[in-house]
């Protein structure tokens, strides 16, 4: 698997997120020790949001409540905006929305999964009308992977468009089909 290329850190645009209206937000639960400066928590990551754990963790086999990290980016300076600058490490308190069917996100936080390189991935994006692609959680990694295999169980989404995030970097838009 290969991480989608970014200029710095991942970003997230919430196109439709029911958790904002429904109050299904985790914001007073710290990140686990899994998140370090070398492997930080970024916007758009899927995490284990079960508060019974007393901390936000990377997904594992059997995760029952997936959340998506959507911590608000800050302005980092007069000409440097926070969209691709933001990350969190262990002990920080990110905002995490509980995924629900019908949510729609645009993000560059994903793994190219089934595709060997960016060229193969972009070719697959051109065929979305005829060959659907899906995003699925990966145990031990917050970046969901893109796959051509439709999941038969668990949380997953379907890629609907290859586009950009507001700072102009390439991204995918996907809708959650099962949460």
Stretches found by the model and what they are:
Residues 1-179:
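Surface-exposed, low-hydrophobicity beta-strand/loop segments enriched in small/polar/acidic residues
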